[in-house]
UniProtKB/Swiss-Prot annotation:
<protein>
    <recommendedName>
        <fullName>tRNA N6-adenosine threonylcarbamoyltransferase</fullName>
        <ecNumber>2.3.1.234</ecNumber>
    </recommendedName>
</protein>
<feature type="binding site">
    <location>
        <begin position="140"/>
        <end position="144"/>
    </location>
    <ligand>
        <name>substrate</name>
    </ligand>
</feature>
<keyword id="KW-0479">Metal-binding</keyword>
<dbReference type="InterPro" id="IPR000905">
    <property type="entry name" value="Gcp-like_dom"/>
</dbReference>
<dbReference type="Pfam" id="PF00814">
    <property type="entry name" value="TsaD"/>
</dbReference>
<feature type="binding site">
    <location>
        <position position="187"/>
    </location>
    <ligand>
        <name>substrate</name>
    </ligand>
</feature>
<feature type="binding site">
    <location>
        <position position="174"/>
    </location>
    <ligand>
        <name>substrate</name>
    </ligand>
</feature>
<dbReference type="InterPro" id="IPR017861">
    <property type="entry name" value="KAE1/TsaD"/>
</dbReference>
<feature type="binding site">
    <location>
        <position position="191"/>
    </location>
    <ligand>
        <name>substrate</name>
    </ligand>
</feature>
<keyword id="KW-0408">Iron</keyword>
<dbReference type="GO" id="GO:0005506">
    <property type="term" value="F:iron ion binding"/>
</dbReference>
<dbReference type="InterPro" id="IPR022450">
    <property type="entry name" value="TsaD"/>
</dbReference>
<comment type="function">
    <text>Required for the formation of a threonylcarbamoyl group on adenosine at position 37 (t(6)A37) in tRNAs that read codons beginning with adenine. Is involved in the transfer of the threonylcarbamoyl moiety of threonylcarbamoyl-AMP (TC-AMP) to the N6 group of A37, together with TsaE and TsaB. TsaD likely plays a direct catalytic role in this reaction.</text>
</comment>
<dbReference type="GO" id="GO:0005737">
    <property type="term" value="C:cytoplasm"/>
</dbReference>
<keyword id="KW-0819">tRNA processing</keyword>
<keyword id="KW-0808">Transferase</keyword>
<dbReference type="GO" id="GO:0002949">
    <property type="term" value="P:tRNA threonylcarbamoyladenosine modification"/>
</dbReference>
Length: 347
């Protein structure tokens, strides 16, 4: 039970894609974070299948809640508020999480907060490094999203600076991995292969670089890699998977970090948060640290487990909106597959 001297106990539920995540948070303290992933079920299809994801969430939700509560050493009746992802994401997957959260809120008579998945990726950094400075620029890089945000206040003031106009960075990783006969999801195997490669051996294009915006494009890069591999095979030249992986990874990290640093400079921001599944990439982390150090910018990257989808990010954002005194969401709220980042809380 929460005492007057303690921050409220928040349960967070995440189900926007292929991870069922449940976590318990007090303020910036993570008590438990349990994730059930269906990635292996999607691997044979080479990508996430919405129907498979929804069924996996249905099977995993209750056991994941139980494991998280046990690990946190709390009872569900101890919870002060429940936070749940309402978007963006896959409609069926989101609906499973929202339905579960509504059921718990009604059964326990607790307030429910429907929050934004993307802003959760920023909020989770507080569980790793403490309260966020205000303002920060956030670079979110995942399989479904690549966005630059200006965050003046996590609960009330998040602005979209730019986003991908076609493929997300993580999606490009998956497609390039398939070209190189590497397993799904593509991020980790490309990162491993690139360690033995030369990132300067091949020059791949940097989409939308120097266009005066903070938008991204990775479709042209993916096509350029495909053409390079096809040309090499047609001409009988050996395809060095490590070199292709390293050069591709260099192109992605180059554009992401340059635009992120430029956004910090333009808005007078001295702190950059990088999160999302692709934030676990070693070259992206190294180049971000190098360029931010040169620009006098502090870069904050959560540990890899917190970068991927999880309940901790949703509980962390829930803790923020509760602390801000914002009213709960209505119990008749619906999922929103294209929820804009400016909508931190559904109310």
């Amino acid at each position: 039970m929460t005492t007057a001297s303690q921050p409220p106990l928040i349960m967070g539920i995440e189900s926007s894609c292929d991870e069922t995540g449940v976590a318990f948070v007090r303020g910036c303290e993570l008590l438990a974070d349990e994730v059930a992933s269906s990635v292996d079920e999607h691997a044979r299809f080479g990508g996430v299948v919405p129907e498979v994801a929804s069924r996996a969430h249905l099977e995993a939700m209750t056991p994941t809640v139980r494991r998280a509560a046990e690990r946190a050493g709390v009872r569900l009746s101890d919870v002060d508020a429940i936070a749940v992802t309402v978007g963006p994401g896959l409609a069926g997957a989101l609906l499973v999480g929202l339905s579960a959260a509504k059921a718990y809120a009604l059964a326990l008579d607790k307030p429910l907060y429907g929050v934004n998945h993307l802003v959760g990726h920023v909020a989770v950094d507080q569980l790793e490094h403490g309260p966020l400075p205000k303002p920060v620029v956030a670079l979110l890089v995942s399989g479904g999203h690549t966005s630059l945000l200006l965050v003046r206040d996590l609960a009330t003031d998040v602005q979209l600076l730019g986003e991908t106009v076609d493929d997300a960075a993580g999606e490009a990783y998956d497609k390039v991995a398939r070209l190189l006969n590497l397993p799904y999801p593509g991020g980790p195997p490309i990162d491993r292969a690139a360690r033995d490669g030369d990132g300067t051996a091949i020059h791949f294009p940097r989409g939308k670089w120097g266009d005066g915006t903070y938008d991204f494009s990775f479709s042209g890069l993916k096509t350029a890699v495909a053409r390079w591999v096809e040309d090499a095979e047609r001409q009988g030249r050996p395809v060095s998977v490590p070199d292709v992986a390293a050069a591709f990874q260099e192109a992605v990290a180059d554009v992401l970090t340059r635009k992120a640093v430029d956004a910090c400079r333009e808005h007078g921001v001295r702190h950059l948060v990088i999160s999302g599944g692709v934030a676990a990439n070693s070259r992206l982390r190294a180049l971000a640290e190098e360029r931010c150090a040169a620009a006098g910018i502090e870069v904050r990257v959560p540990r890899p487990r917190l970068c991927t989808d999880n309940g901790a990010m949703i509980a962390a954002l829930g803790a923020e909106v509760v602390a801000a005194g914002l009213p709960p969401s209505p119990l008749d709220m619906a999922v929103d597959t294209s929820l804009p980042v400016s909508s931190v809380l559904v109310n």
